């Protein structure tokens, strides 16, 4: 166990690993500790879509950075990442949504993000098995893609190690030691690490850990489900990811079938007071009744789902924030205590850019 490190990152999901990677690339002394194994929280069960288009221009730029990073990471580290730049479709099914897409196109082009406007038929040419009866138009981002969340994280961790970062698994953070308002150490169950700065990337555990030093992180865990189908005729390996915000659903190709999930208007919270310490590589029980509303929306878009075999329905809790934006930066309550959490189920897309931004702040 090391005795000191200028910077300690708590949490070995994709955001923690990305932050370690970027800090190490800046030549800074950094140690990452993870209470279980890397990706054991919510990273391992994420669907893995990597889309760049958001209503916020700054976030869109961070997501664009993630794409650039993931595109080179496998070559840099020698580890497979599952990264596939198959493009992403975003549907608009009414005039209001179409106007939003037009505004986003202008924003995207202003900082060099490639984005094409498509007719319903052109969108269907890229995604042949979807119904377009209610589609007003679509946006296509050819540099969107998908990745294997665990593999991406392991590649980031290797890249960090290659630049001198220390990564220590199965080590639980217990207490931040503060003297006269200054962070001086982090106590763990394996010993104390003298440090100057702490970056809290604990995912769903962030709120409860940050509270121990008086830092408020407004996030809560919600159940988030997606299903994985058997092979479906017409689903090719290069099928773009698909987002349908008016139906609150998304799709990606998964070994010749589809992964499909969505966002219920009445989501179910989980572990509101405290996320269990040992919730590692764990899932919640599938809730087919609650998923029915998402499934009905998806059937309207992809009728072939009605006869598709279902491999599994994955119910993995994710952390969400009140405004739908992630929480990133130095806490106002404690100097040199940084937070990267609350990624609202798009942490894989945000991970590369969020880690870069955190590293530059730290």
Segments predicted by a language model, with ranges:
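Flavin-dependent oxidoreductases
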Residues: 18, 53, 176-287, 293-305
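N-terminal Rossmann-like FAD-binding beta1-loop-alpha1 element of flavoenzymes
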Residues: 5-31
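Dinucleotide-binding Rossmann-like beta1-alpha1 core, especially the glycine-rich loop
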Residues: 48-126, 248-251, 255-257, 278, ...
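Helix-loop-beta segment of a Rossmann-like dinucleotide-binding subdomain
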Residues: 81-90, 104, 120, 124-163, ...
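Helical element adjacent to the flavin cofactor pocket in flavoenzyme catalytic cores
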Residues: 139-197
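Glycine-rich FAD pyrophosphate-binding loop
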Residues: 24-44
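C-terminal catalytic lobe of FAD-dependent flavoproteins
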Residues: 149, 246, 285-362
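Short beta-strand to alpha-helix junction loop
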Residues: 61-64, 91-100, 140-158, 168, ...
């Amino acid at each position: 166990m090391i005795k000191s490190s200028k910077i300690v990152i708590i949490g070995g999901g994709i955001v923690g690993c990305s932050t370690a990677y970027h800090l190490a690339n800046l030549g800074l002394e950094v140690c990452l500790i993870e209470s279980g194994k890397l990706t054991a929280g919510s990273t391992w069960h994420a669907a893995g879509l990597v889309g760049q288009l958001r209503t916020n221009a700054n976030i869109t730029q961070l997501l664009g950075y993630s794409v650039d990073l993931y595109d080179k990471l496998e070559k840099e580290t020698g580890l497979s990442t599952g990264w596939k730049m198959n493009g992403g479709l975003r549907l608009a099914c009414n005039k209001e949504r179409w106007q939003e897409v037009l505004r986003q196109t202008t924003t995207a082009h202003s900082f060099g993000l490639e984005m094409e406007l498509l007719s319903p038929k052109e969108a269907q040419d890229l995604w042949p098995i979807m119904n377009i009866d209610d589609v007003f138009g679509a946006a296509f981002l050819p540099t969107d893609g998908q990745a294997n969340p665990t593999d991406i994280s392991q590649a980031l961790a290797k890249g960090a190690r290659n630049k001198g970062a220390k990564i220590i698994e199965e080590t639980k953070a217990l207490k931040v030691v503060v003297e006269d308002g200054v962070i001086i150490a982090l106590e763990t169950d394996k010993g104390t690490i003298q440090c100057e700065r702490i970056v809290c990337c604990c995912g769903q555990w962030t709120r409860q850990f940050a509270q121990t030093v008086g830092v408020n992180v407004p996030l809560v865990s919600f159940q988030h489900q997606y299903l994985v189908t058997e092979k479906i005729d017409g689903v090719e390996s290069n099928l773009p990811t698909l987002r349908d915000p008016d139906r609150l659903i998304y799709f990606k190709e998964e070994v010749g079938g589809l992964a499909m999930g969505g966002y219920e208007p009445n989501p179910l919270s989980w572990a509101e007071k405290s996320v269990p310490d040992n919730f590692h590589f764990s899932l919640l029980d599938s809730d087919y009744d609650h998923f029915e509303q998402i499934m009905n929306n998806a059937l309207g878009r992809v009728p072939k789902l009605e006869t598709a075999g279902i491999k599994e329905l994955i119910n993995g809790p994710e952390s969400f924030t009140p405004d739908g934006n992630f929480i990133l930066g130095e806490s106002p309550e404690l100097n040199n205590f940084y937070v990267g959490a609350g990624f609202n189920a798009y942490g894989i897309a945000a991970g590369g850019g969020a880690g870069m931004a955190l590293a530059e702040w730290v």
